[in-house]
Every structure is written in C-alpha cells, then in structure tokens.
Amino acid sequence: MSKRVRSSLILPAVCGLGLAAVLLSSCSSKAPQQPARQAGISGPGDYSRPHRDGAPWWDVDVSRIPDAVPMPHNGSVKANPYTVLGKTYYPMNDARAYRMVGTASWYGTKFHGQATANGETYDLYGMTAAHKTLPLPSYVRVTNLDNGKSVIVRVNDRGPFYSDRVIDLSFAAAKKLGYAETGTARVKVEGIDPVQWWAQRGRPAPMVLAQPKQAVAQAPAATQTQAVAMAQPIETYTPPPAQHAAAVLPVQIDSKKNASLPADGLYLQVGAFANPDAAELLKAKLSGVTAAPVFISSVVRNQQILHRVRLGPIGSADEVSRTQDSIRVANLGQPTLVRPD
C-alpha cells in the first residue's frame, strides 16, 4: 500500500476484539456477506474511520465490481495549479494522450467516506484513483506489469505526494490488479478518450450535460474579463498528514538571483516557495506570458528559505494591470503589488 498506508491488514485485530456481529462475520469461516451501502458508499452501517490506514475489515468480492465506465465530460475539468508543502503542481487539461510507467500504491479505510479533491466521496470499493497532474475527472487504464492484469479507473483525487509513486488507486482497484497485499506494483498508466472508447464498442458516447453557469451577459465587459481571469487561481491544497511529502532540505541562497534591481518602477509577486524547483518552474511559465522581467528573490523567513517569484520593474500602473490580467488568464496565480527589497 502507499507510504501513507502504513498499517498492516487489521483483520486479525478485529477478530480478536470480538466487536459487532457484522465485524465478526469477517473472521468466521462462512462466506462474508455483502455490506450495506450507506450514504452512497460501501461498508457497514456502523463504520467508524480508523486512525491509521489499511485494508477494510468487511469483505467484498472485487471480481464482481465493474471497472469505471469512461464518460465524456462536457463541463470544465479541475486542472488548477495547486501547491503542496511549497511545491506547485500544474495539472494538464487533457488526459487522453497521457502515458506513464512507474509505481502504483493504494489507500483505504482512513480515507473511506472523505471528500476527494474534486468534491466526490471516496469509496475504497469504488474504481477510482488519485493523481498529481491529471485533470479531474478523467479516466485511465492501469496495467500491472508483473501479471498483465488491467483496470479502468476514474481519476477524482490528488496524490500520492511521493516522488517514486505515479498513481494511488482505491483498495478495490489495487486488489483487482493483485497488489493489495504487497502494497505497491509497477504499472503502466494510459489515458482514455471516452468518445473513442464508446466508438470501439460500436455505440455512441452518452451525452453528459455540463453544470449550468451563472449568467454574465448583463455584466460590463471589464467585469466579464475579470471573472474569466480569476476563474482558476493557484490553490493551496493541504493533504492529510499521512500523505505529506518529505520536507525540503535547506539550501544556500543564490546571490546571483538576488542581484540588486533598479528601485524605480513597480513590482509584482506571483508566488513564494520553499521548493526552489517550483519557483524556477513558475518563473519559466511566467516568462512565456509576459514581457516584464521575471526573477527569483530568495529570503529567510522564520528560519525557512522562501524563493519569491517576482516581476519588475514595471513602468506604469496600466502596464501592471495588463500584466496581472495576463497572468490570471494563464492560470498562473494572483499577482500582487510588492515593494522591492
């Protein structure tokens, strides 16, 4: 299972405690009963979330759980840039051409029933997955390279935040792939085009209506532009503590990056990161959308090095406004005026 899933299978402990009959049934030699679905998720009615993650103590025959069915998504997808512990991720808007080989993990009881990153409810017996940069929702085929088994899952969550993991699957998906007991597996992840998937089966793709949007037709043109520009700011996403990535090691401040800049003119700051790589990535992206000089200014705050991504000097307030609009429309953050230091 994932590094955030550190507990071993907890079934023996449950059997020893002799709790409710529904739990004891998992320990008996008789075939386990299917759990009743409560509030849209699987599991017993008296489910109580454990403090540590692990496998469920109620059993379901995962061979009878169908794979996720790829559905076209005609509304907006969740692909906002977001920051985890100082590192900013820039999700893609289209998963259809995605291909990756790497390590998969899984997550279970601790997150069962909790909201996912796109607001859905995590069901450990659902066919879903978490990914750092795929759009939410999207669909991928995951193949276990050790045994050739494959599943289709719906990506609706963010994670895992460890450099050696490419995807986190639900417990059911991991069990169908044959690695729930070992915790991880080497997999191939392939994006799916839902329209093509349905066409290969000789059927038209179902029509999924987008969510209604608030009308802005009567709003002044400037207001409409601002509404579009501010639609997708960089998010600060705080995952559960068990998912946190390793802390960034202290680094030396590069004096060349902090070379003195002209004091005249106006300056914007778009982000501040503990991770210097995240700052460099944002700097590179900003350089592609604005003609204003982009630089990194590193300072120490509360015994931590922060790498601030800034623009300037900018000659006028009008130019500042245009630059801010360009950055917002590109979904690269919310630039704010700062004093040069």
Swiss-Prot record:
Q: What is the effect of changing residue 157 to N?
A: Lack of transglycosylase activity
Membrane-related topology note: Lipid-anchor
- Please state what class of enzyme this protein is: lyase
Coarse class of the protein's main subcellular location = membrane
Q: Which UniProt keywords apply?
A: Cell membrane, Cell wall biogenesis/degradation, Lipoprotein, Lyase, Membrane, Palmitate, Signal
Q: Where is the signal peptide?
A: 1-26
The EC code for this enzyme is: 4.2.2.-
- Positions with an attached lipid (N-palmitoyl cysteine) read 27
CDD domains, from UniProt?
DPBB_RlpA-like
Q: Which SUPFAM superfamilies match?
A: Barwin-like endoglucanases, Sporulation related repeat
Q: Which GO terms describe its molecular function?
A: lytic endotransglycosylase activity; peptidoglycan binding
Query: Lipidation sites of kind S-diacylglycerol cysteine?
Result: 27
Q: Which GO terms describe its cellular component?
A: cell outer membrane; plasma membrane
> What results from gene inactivation?
Mutants form chains of short, fat cells when grown in low osmotic strength media.
Q: Name one GO biological process term.
A: peptidoglycan metabolic process
Q: Where in the cell is it found?
A: Cell membrane
Where the record annotates domain SPOR, the positions are: 260-341
Q: Which PANTHER family match?
A: ENDOLYTIC PEPTIDOGLYCAN TRANSGLYCOSYLASE RLPA
What the protein does comes down to: Lytic transglycosylase with a strong preference for naked glycan strands that lack stem peptides. Required for efficient separation of daughter cells and maintenance of rod shape.
- What's the family? Belongs to the RlpA family.
Record note on domains: The SPOR domain is important for normal localization, but not for cell division or rod shape.
- This protein is called Endolytic peptidoglycan transglycosylase RlpA
